[in-house]
């Protein structure tokens, strides 16, 4: 992860903690969910605070509670709904790119990804694989990868002004991506 993210001038700490919880659940997927205790311990937020934040996130369907032997939490469908609205607000200059991606995929019989550059990370926004393909890629729509780690990211780097390209590598620690 690079350090190019926006730093708010006047951060709202409670909102930041709620978003940290969402990101923690996202980054630690489990079909059984994640316990309040684990979230509290990992994020160093008191259990009562985590409980109140989770309760609020449940009210917006961003988190759902799994009732089992001990309650656990997972991402809710409200986030899925919110995420699906993103491409509708970013129309790529009004282009309907799906037919183009389909044609490329079917012509060359190769996995075809369309991505955008966001905070110096490549984000896949559309992926198509040919039906007859035996070997599948493990990339997912919505996945973020550092620019240096993917062909798509390197394509974005090739279009950066030289000073921005140099600044990127001065501020980025290169790590092997699994």
Language-model regions, residue ranges each:
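N-terminal helix-turn-helix
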Residues: 2-89
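Amphipathic alpha-helical effector-binding/dimerization core
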Residues: 69, 74-170
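Active-site-proximal mixed secondary-structure blocks
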Residues: 173-178
């Amino acid at each position: 992860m690079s350090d190019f993210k926006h730093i708010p001038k006047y951060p709202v700490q409670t909102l930041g903690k709620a978003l940290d919880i969402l990101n923690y659940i996202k980054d630690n997927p489990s079909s059984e969910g994640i316990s309040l205790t684990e979230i509290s311990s990992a994020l160093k937020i008191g259990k009562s605070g985590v409980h109140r934040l989770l309760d609020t996130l449940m009210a917006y369907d961003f988190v759902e509670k799994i009732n089992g032997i001990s309650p656990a939490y997972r991402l809710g469908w409200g986030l899925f709904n919110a995420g699906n609205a993103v491409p509708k607000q970013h129309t790529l200059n009004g282009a309907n790119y799906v037919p183009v991606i389909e044609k490329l995929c079917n012509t060359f019989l190769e996995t075809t990804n369309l991505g955008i550059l966001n905070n110096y990370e490549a984000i896949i926004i559309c992926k198509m694989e040919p039906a007859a393909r035996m070997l599948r890629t493990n990339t997912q729509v919505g996945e973020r990868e550092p620019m240096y780690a993917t062909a798509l990211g390197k394509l974005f780097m090739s279009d950066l002004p030289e000073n921005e390209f140099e600044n990127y590598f001065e501020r980025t620690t290169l790590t092997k991506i699994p």
